[in-house]
Amino acid sequence: MVNLLSEKTSGTNVAEFTVSEIAGALKRVVEEKFGYVRVRGEISGYRGAHASGHAYFALKDDKARLEAVIWRGVMEKLKFPPEEGMEVVAVGKLTTYPGSSKYQIVIEALEPTGVGALMTLLENRKKKFAEEGLFDEAKKKPLPYMPRIIGVVTSPTGAVIRDIIHRISDRFPLHVLVWPVRVQGETSGSEVAAAVEGFNALASEGHIPKPDLIIVARGGGSLEDLWGFNDEAVVRAVYASDLPIISAVGHETDWTLIDYVADWRAPTPTGAAEKAVPVKLDLEVCVASLGARLRKGLARSFDFHQQKLCAARRGLPSADQLFSLPRRGFDEISSRLQRALCVSYDKKRFSFHALHLRLSPRLLKSEKAQRHTKEYTARLYRAFMRSVEKKRSALELACRLLKSTSYQNILERGFVLVLGQNHKPIKRLAQFPESGQINLRFFDGDIHVATQEPFSAARSKHKKIKSPSDDQGTLF
């Protein structure tokens, strides 16, 4: 620092520096003076890791605030993820950021300030979720008795998945789907939540079958190791799941928030496998036992009803005794029917004989003639009616023809019939009288008209009309 000041002294006692020189000098002083430090404070402004994987937040107490940064490589190695409001002890190097004239700590290790801080945070979350009703027993779903497919959310390389698969294979071999996740570290909570949501999003008839049950499992560990299963995203994903979920996180004494929201909590991953599937051999023994009991019950029922049938048969009369009375009645009815037929035959024969005596050939001929007379009368009447109808049709045709040729129809169309004094029609101009009266006949009456103009004068005013030929017919 002395060398820097001595180099920049020029004629006065005030040193002159560039901004970069001052910032660099301060950075070197801070880093050389403090080196690695341990800082206790409360995390503030944490919003999760950046897209680059780095995390930026601040450590504060009641009087001061210190900016902090965790690089991506360190974030992936943390035993528990940072959370807003958590009191921690950060280990790292103090440095400055020349671009904004800030000093900060680059964290290389981060630990909560004892288990008490984590337990306080855990209890606060537990109380919050309980008030929202996420832990209600009435909302938990029943587990399927014999699932076809089981989905397991755990690490694919740990002993947990081997124990689960081995236990399921021993009890009831079936299809197991594994969704690999990190079960410890910064991203464990988000990965477990995504796995639960992913299993629920599978199609029932898709290429990857949808499981009937989900097991979320992890081995034992410290509170920090299991902290990812206390993540809010995990709790809400399990609560929103349509598939029943068994939680098997840690040992029997380890409780996480997923254990409260899951539909069933198993003390160990092996216990989860035992709860998920029954023992196939026990089912076979049970089915065999039920089959044997069913066969014995059917045999006893058959024997009982057979004994009742034998007892009833002993109480019944023999076939001869049973049919003797009906047979006697049948014989009596047969004999009575035969006698009745004979009597009826004799009566009919006597009746026919009496009718025969009453009949004679002359009477038969008279009846035959009457039948012929009736038949001829009917035929004559029908012929007469046909003739009458034929004449009526001809008369109607003549009437229609007469009506069509009548001059009355012509008068109705607006024509006038001119009649002379002798009441004969005037057909030609030459027949028109030179003086006197004529009669004009309309369709609805006659009118008398006197001719005042001489016939010769009337003829000269009109063009001569060609007289019709003699072979032309007349309407009158």
UniProtKB/Swiss-Prot annotation:
Chief place where the protein resides: cytoplasm
Protein name (record): Exodeoxyribonuclease 7 large subunit
Organism lineage string: Bacteria, Pseudomonadati, Pseudomonadota, Alphaproteobacteria, Hyphomicrobiales
Cellular component aspect of the GO annotation: cytoplasm; exodeoxyribonuclease VII complex
Quaternary assembly: Heterooligomer composed of large and small subunits.
Reaction catalyzed: Exonucleolytic cleavage in either 5'- to 3'- or 3'- to 5'-direction to yield nucleoside 5'-phosphates
Subcellular location: Cytoplasm
Recorded GO MF terms: exodeoxyribonuclease VII activity; nucleic acid binding
Family of this protein: Belongs to the XseA family.
Keyword Magnesium among UniProt keywords: no
Domain of life: Bacteria
Alphabetized Pfam families for the sequence: Exonuc_VII_L, tRNA_anti_2
UniProt keyword list: Cytoplasm, Exonuclease, Hydrolase, Nuclease
InterPro entries reported in the protein's UniProt record: Exonuc_VII_L (IPR003753), Exonuc_VII_lsu_C (IPR020579), OB-fold_nuc-bd_dom (IPR025824)
GO BP, one annotated term: DNA catabolic process
EC numbers on record: 3.1.11.6
EC top class named in words: hydrolase
Task performed by this protein: Bidirectionally degrades single-stranded DNA into large acid-insoluble oligonucleotides, which are then degraded further into small acid-soluble oligonucleotides.
